[in-house]
């Protein structure tokens, strides 16, 4: 069988309009990540994201969480068998504010950093955030490193907890996930915190009455 001339085939297909339309190149983001996600003081910036995992019986659980970008504490989280939606995000927002401020609201806006998921961009989500004293901020499109603290947390939770905890079904997995979040906050060391856990770092800061910068030097 004679060899097929690919260039000739291409030329004939082009002449007869048989080629697929070329996908336009995606322009580079005008909001390229150039700064740091971490901040020097607690309650300046929180970040939020979501992830999912599968139980042994095939159930899929979807988790939404919020972290402080300074002390790394997991402020609040929610798990569901449904999709990522605005209602769940609002529950996490409210839980995070209650965790840090009780019945009060922040005295100055706390930046709420997320990706561009529809549950975060929804008008009702953004309006609710501002009611709670949060200022919604979205990362640059196609720039996951812009929410690197949340991305790193997902890897840690999946690697150090979810991969080894019993998860025969959704109910059992949710209970064990609650213990995982508690263990992370109390015991998981962070290099950025001088190899202390989030709550160990917070307790030491409160005990010494020092700023976050000074705590990092201890």
UniProtKB/Swiss-Prot annotation:
**What region holds the Integrase catalytic domain?**
23-206
Q: Which UniProt keywords apply?
A: DNA recombination, DNA-binding, Transposable element, Transposition
Q: Name one GO molecular function term.
A: DNA binding
Do you know which Gene3D superfamilies this protein is assigned to? Answer: Ribonuclease H-like superfamily/Ribonuclease H
Task: Name the InterPro entries for this protein.
Answer: Integrase_cat-core (IPR001584), RNaseH-like_sf (IPR012337), RNaseH_sf (IPR036397), Transpos_IS3 (IPR048020)
Gene Ontology annotations of biological process type: DNA integration; DNA recombination; transposition
Q: What does this protein do?
A: Involved in the transposition of the insertion sequence IS2.
Q: What is this protein called?
A: Putative transposase InsD for insertion element IS2E
What organism is recorded for this protein? Escherichia coli (strain K12)
